[in-house]
């Protein structure tokens, strides 16, 4: 349903943001 889709999108965005922050903090960016 709609809420399930929104939840999945939010989870994906949060995961991306966290990965980006980790990358910047550790300097271990992976492309």
Curated annotation (Swiss-Prot):
Pfam families assigned to the protein according to its UniProt record, in alphabetical order: Antimicrobial_2 (PF08023)
Localization, UniProt: Secreted
Broad class of the protein's primary localization: secreted
InterPro entries found in the cross-reference section: Antimicrobial_frog_2
Gene Ontology CC terms, in alphabetical order: extracellular region
Keywords on record: Amphibian defense peptide, Antibiotic, Antimicrobial, Disulfide bond, Secreted
Tissue expression summary: Expressed by the skin glands.
Protein origin, superkingdom: Eukaryota
Any one biological process term the GO annotation gives: defense response to Gram-negative bacterium
Protein name: Ranatuerin-2PL
């Amino acid at each position: 349903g709609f809420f399930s889709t929104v939840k999945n999108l939010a989870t994906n965005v949060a995961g991306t943001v966290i990965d980006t922050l980790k990358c910047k903090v550790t300097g271990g960016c992976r492309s």
